[in-house]
Amino acid sequence: MTAVQLIVGLGNPGPEYDQTRHNAGALFVERVAESQRVNLAVDRKYFGLVGKFNHQGREVRLLIPTTYMNRSGQSVAALANFFKIKPEEILVAHDELDMPPGVAKLKQGGGHGGHNGLRDIISQLGNQNNFHRLRLGIGHPGHASLVSGYVLGRAPRSEQELLDQSIDFALDVLPEILAGDWTVAMRKLHSQKATK
């Protein structure tokens, strides 16, 4: 069981991107920080908002890159390399077009699925893709040409409530995630689905 040492939440910086679908991962890390009473502060060395807390005698770091999404790997690699955190000790939370709002799933490894944040992280980690992912469903607009505007848009309240519920489900399995008990975390999380 590989325990997590770094939790990353992907998004774009600036008020114009706050609460957009693409910032679902950043929203998750903000909620983790709240739950652990962690103050996230800008650290230019790591190109992001950074915080840490202790879990069973070891440090767990939180990171929200303040680069744009397609440069997320610069931030993740800077922090992971400095603290000698291996890819398999990293959890990256991100928005997922291929799942409906209200669904959250964990997986390890795999490709980037067209997600520019994941693409850059894989590249900056030396093409290592075996980090863990928390995929937060945001749904799909129906056509590839609509994706950019969709992910950079704010969800209607009913959809945002479903995303918030899926983040709650993920927070419920945070103890298992931190312990590296992925089988139990997946079983619990994957049986949940938000309701309107």
From Swiss-Prot:
InterPro entries found in the cross-reference section: Pept_tRNA_hydro, Pept_tRNA_hydro_CS, Pept_tRNA_hydro_sf
Active site: H22 (proton acceptor)
Record site: Discriminates between blocked and unblocked aminoacyl-tRNA: N12
Major location (coarse): cytoplasm
EC number: 3.1.1.29
Compartments reported by the entry: Cytoplasm
GO molecular function: peptidyl-tRNA hydrolase activity; tRNA binding
Site (Stabilizes the basic form of H active site to accept a proton) residue list: D95
GO BP, sorted A to Z: protein quality control for misfolded or incompletely synthesized proteins; rescue of stalled ribosome
Subunit: Monomer.
UniProt-recorded name of the protein: Peptidyl-tRNA hydrolase
Native source species: Ectopseudomonas mendocina (strain ymp)
Encoding gene, per UniProt annotation: pth
